[in-house]
Amino acid sequence: MSVLREGLGRYLSPAALETLGRARIGIAGAGGLGSNVAMLLLRSGIRHFVLVDRDRVEASNLNRQFYWPEDVGKRKAEALMNRLSQIEPGVDCRCHAVAVNASNAVSLFSDCDVVVEALDEAGHKAAFSALWLGVGYYVVAASGLGGYGLPPMQVRNLGKSFVCVGDFATAADVDAPPLAPRVMQAAALQADAVLAHILISKQN
């Protein structure tokens, strides 16, 4: 048993740890949302991930993403896997350095219990989320997380299998830059929604 799982045993029952340890989470995008969602879920007992991102780590990512200066230039999915393995050596990550689109999304995440939308551009986020409507997967998305001191984050259940978090108003741009506090807040809400779904659905 790893040090992390030993410590989690103080807070979670063996049954809960087993349930979390069996779940596989797909994450589309390994940037500010995706990298932090993965880190938060790992620290909460998730051990299996599918990480999809074609980009490389840049210096401008370090203000809000779960990477170190020495990761700059590396593929995000692989760099994230390495960071996660430092916390939990037994983590299982399948990494894909590709762009997610309508032709490959379902196959990439086919065996996942939950799919997390963690893409950057509004158009890509909307298109990705629309792919899953009626497919039967549980999807957790985000919308509106730029700036600082702006409207509070919300969690909206948009049907039985779709949750979206954010302020639903503030896109990250020049006037409302993506800064760590609100990005992390959205990522934490996404991770919490994933945990709640896994633990509650498996108990019912």
Predicted regions and their residues:
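A structured beta-alpha segment of the ubiquitous adenosine-cofactor-binding alpha/beta core
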Residues: 75-112, 119-122
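Glycine-rich phosphate-binding loop and adjoining beta1-alpha1-beta2 segment
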Residues: 51-87
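Glycine-rich adenosine-cofactor-binding loop
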Residues: 21-42, 50-53
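Non-cysteine beta-strand/loop elements that form the S-adenosyl-L-methionine
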Residues: 49-54, 165-167
